[in-house]
């Protein structure tokens, strides 16, 4: 019993220490207001961005949700912050939450865009498309199938022996590859131009094509690259999603997400084939030829 208490104490202590690694700002007085489809959270320094962002969010809501034929079950939280010298956006699709850093980002590899319109549409497209692709809803982000085998125990006072085999197989609740997640979020919806294909993006893709260095279909499925590699996952994903929309209709992006929501579907190659009639690898080859 003492041993169990000790282990529990270590667990609680570890959780407490982990919490100390993060930081907050207790001096900030957060405020919230509601729109038809969003809860907007801000403080004095971000109120202007929050009110403009709320307008943008409501303007793009019908377009993004119509593309995927899906609306979040509850109002999506959008948090506007500007604590640090930092620009970004993040979508937590299992929490139905978006964080927006209010400072505009002018990224050399993507040209100039209107920041709030771009980042809010991008992150909300993540929320909608990835929730559409979930296999078991928002309450079950994943599971493990596990099997344990124990040694035979000879002593009658011991219930079972020491574990000698462990099989653990993950069952993710969402299996959208990075190129599709980011590519569809940059595509946004038909007619959107907040994150358009500009000369900067074209330069990156053209350079890879001319040097026979296009990311393969497999390479597009992962991040963790060096140099411009991670940006090329975004860039190639945007180009491929645009190719899909142009050749099979924007609805094909939704159909791919629908196929990936099938609890037994874990192959992007097969999901694309179900949605478009051609396999993912064949579609990629056609995309490569078009470049």
Model-derived features: where do they sit?
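Acidic/His/Gly-enriched intrinsically disordered linker/tail segments
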Residues: 25, 95, 115-119, 131-291
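Residue-level marker of positions within ordered structural domains that often coincide
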Residues: 13-16, 69, 190, 246
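Bacterial Sec-dependent N-terminal signal peptides
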Residues: 1-24
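Juxtacatalytic substrate-recognition/specificity segment
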Residues: 19-170
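Generic low-complexity, intrinsically disordered sequence content enriched
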Residues: 14-17, 113, 257
């Amino acid at each position: 019993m003492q041993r169990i208490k000790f282990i529990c104490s270590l667990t609680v202590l570890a959780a407490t220490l982990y919490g100390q690694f993060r930081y907050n700002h207790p001096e900030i007085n957060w405020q919230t207001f509601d729109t038809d489809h969003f809860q907007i959270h801000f403080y004095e320094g971000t109120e202007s961005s929050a009110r403009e962002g709320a307008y943008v969010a409501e303007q793009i809501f019908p377009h993004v949700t119509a593309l995927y034929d899906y609306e979040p079950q509850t109002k999506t939280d959008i948090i506007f912050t500007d604590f640090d010298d930092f620009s970004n956006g993040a979508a937590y699709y299992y929490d139905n939450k978006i964080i927006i850093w209010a400072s505009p980002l002018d990224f050399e590899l993507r040209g100039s865009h209107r920041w709030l319109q771009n980042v809010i549409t991008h992150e909300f497209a993540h929320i909608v498309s990835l929730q559409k692709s979930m296999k078991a809803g928002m309450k079950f982000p994943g599971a493990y199938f596990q099997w344990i085998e124990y040694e035979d125990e000879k002593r009658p006072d011991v219930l079972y022996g020491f574990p000698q085999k462990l099989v653990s197989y993950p069952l993710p609740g969402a299996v959208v590859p990075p190129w599709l997640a980011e590519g569809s979020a940059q595509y946004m919806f038909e007619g959107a131009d907040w994150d358009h294909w500009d000369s900067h993006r074209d330069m990156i893709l053209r350079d890879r094509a001319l040097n026979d260095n296009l990311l393969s279909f497999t390479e597009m499925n992962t991040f963790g690259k060096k140099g411009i590699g991670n940006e090329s996952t975004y860039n190639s994903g945007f180009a491929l999603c645009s190719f899909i929309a142009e050749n099979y209709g924007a609805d094909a992006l939704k159909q791919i997400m629908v196929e990936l929501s099938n609890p037994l579907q874990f192959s992007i190659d097969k999901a694309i084939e179900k949605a478009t009639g051609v396999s993912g690898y064949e579609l990629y080859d056609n995309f490569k030829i078009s470049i």
